[in-house]
Amino acid sequence: WRVIYVEGGPFSDYQRIFQGLALGLEERGLIENGHVPLPKDSEEARGMWEWLHQHAGGKRLVFLADGFYSANWDSQQREKVRQEVLRRIREKKDVDMVLAFGTWAGQDLAAQDLPVPVIVSSVTNAVDAGIIPSVEDSGRDNLVAPIEPDRFKRQVLLFHDIFAFQKLGIAYEDT
């Protein structure tokens, strides 16, 4: 399977999720080496992609050398990336699977009728973002967008189990 990576822009959470994905692929025998190092002092995942291209090994998955796409949080670049990825999948036909990291990438690829699997990761709420229609079903046989509706409730309960707090304050930025 020839794989590409698409993101809206660099984000440190993508690195950790991508690293966990690589380790899971190794654990399941899909690649030989999933021990991709996290970049220091950077939120970029491109270096991780390049590392996997060179070191993942195995015969099942190929991380395409030119298969890393990022819009760098630029809305004009986002459209260019979307068009380039769609053209590559539909016309060049050298992609068998897409890893879409974040809301932008998930929205841009979920809305398309693509002939390849799309795995969406690191989206706070894929239903609210319009990536999938419901928690029960992505609406497309080739689209996976994991969602955990009670995530924040579970986090607070876990935090309470650990620290047994009596009062809880929440700091947030009203953006």
Q: Could you describe each region identified by the protein language model?
A:
Residues 1-175:
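Short hydrophobic alpha-helices and adjacent helix-cap/hinge residues
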